């Protein structure tokens, strides 16, 4: 990957609540949950189903777009005669018929190849299929482990921005902010704003997206969507659409949705938005297991948030960011609950008490 067009994080707008807190105001900040801003090299898992064929071996170096496996669209279970396998056969081995007179499916068909699954009564069960599809790796890295029927584990090259959930298939593309620069944290993806000019890109949406927009984005050739929150209804609709797409005869390119925070609608965190803005125009990958945005941009300088910068991750003020102003002790909140709280300055307003359990900081 190249670093052309990548802006350093230092050029991004200041974060909300960026004035530096005094040393005395930072007391108790260690009680706030710390969220790592970036992760080191990840180990990404690409699952394999029975019958899938791995095309790489442990130790292989790969680049983005490499076909690492073949997936069987319609795998079937075939029982082999005892004479069809050698005495040293093991579960996970690839099996191929000796010739045109080889084993055939019970419903008819040609000679079979597949993966040996298990042995029962002196006969081996074979997972076989007729329509293999390539599984492409969206990132560069080194193959660490290959386990038939389980998965391929790859150590990714570069850094990663973790999410909480990713739906769809691993993919990669050019990162696009997807909306006006000043509105990227709270932007909304509307289906009417999508066109074929966005083909091959991964869009940063902000806080709001609906299932119709996701379906249209995929049809327009968009490779992925980055959103802060995805509600339950949109999630169910997208998964149903994915199921129909997997069953289609001609599948579209891989498409993924990565959720950065959860189901509640809220803006993208300021420190995270600063990184995404710095990556605009660069090639990034979305992985499913673990859910993350992976990029290999050594020239991207990631600025640390100011001391005392905190974000409200849940509760009435979810999504707001400000400056830690010290411990507030036990306070009474909605519902008559008493919780340990801290003072937080939000939008240059007087400090308010927020439950410590509702806060997070970045490191």
Describe the role of every protein-language-model region.
Residues 1-363:
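Well-ordered secondary-structure scaffolds
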């Amino acid at each position: 990957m190249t670093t052309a067009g990548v802006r350093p994080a230092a050029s991004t707008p200041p974060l909300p609540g960026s004035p530096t807190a005094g040393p005395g105001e930072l007391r108790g900040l260690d009680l706030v949950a710390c969220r790592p801003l970036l992760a080191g090299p990840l180990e990404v898992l690409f699952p394999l189903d029975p019958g899938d064929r791995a095309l790489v071996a442990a130790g292989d170096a790969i680049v983005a777009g490499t076909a690492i496996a073949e997936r069987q669209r319609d795998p079937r279970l075939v029982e082999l005669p005892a004479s069809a396998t050698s005495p040293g056969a093991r579960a996970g081995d690839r099996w191929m018929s000796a010739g045109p007179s080889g084993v055939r499916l019970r419903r008819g068909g040609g000679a079979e190849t597949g993966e040996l699954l298990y042995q029962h009564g002196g006969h081996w069960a074979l997972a076989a299929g007729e329509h293999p599809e390539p599984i492409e790796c969206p990132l560069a890295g080194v193959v660490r482990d290959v386990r038939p029927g389980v998965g391929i584990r790859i150590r990714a090259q570069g850094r990663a921005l973790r999410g909480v959930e990713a739906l769809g298939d691993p993919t990669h593309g050019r990162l696009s902010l997807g909306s006006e620069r000043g509105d990227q944290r709270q932007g909304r993806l509307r289906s009417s704003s999508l066109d074929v000019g966005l083909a091959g890109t991964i869009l940063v949406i902000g806080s709001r997206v609906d299932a119709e927009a996701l379906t249209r984005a995929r049809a327009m050739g968009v490779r992925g969507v980055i959103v802060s929150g995805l509600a339950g209804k949109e999630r169910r609709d997208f998964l149903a659409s994915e199921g129909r797409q997997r069953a289609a005869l001609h599948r579209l390119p891989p498409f993924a949705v990565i959720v950065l925070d959860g189901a509640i609608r809220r803006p993208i965190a300021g420190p995270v938005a600063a990184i995404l803005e710095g990556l605009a125009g660069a090639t990034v990958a979305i992985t499913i297991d673990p859910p993350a945005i992976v990029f290999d941009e050594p020239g991207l300088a990631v600025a640390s948030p100011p001391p005392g910068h905190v974000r409200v991750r849940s509760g009435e003020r979810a999504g707001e960011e400000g400056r830690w102003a010290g411990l507030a002790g036990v306070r009474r909140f909605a519902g008559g609950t008493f919780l340990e709280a801290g003072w937080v300055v939000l939008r240059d307003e007087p400090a308010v008490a927020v439950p410590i359990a509702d806060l997070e900081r970045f490191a």
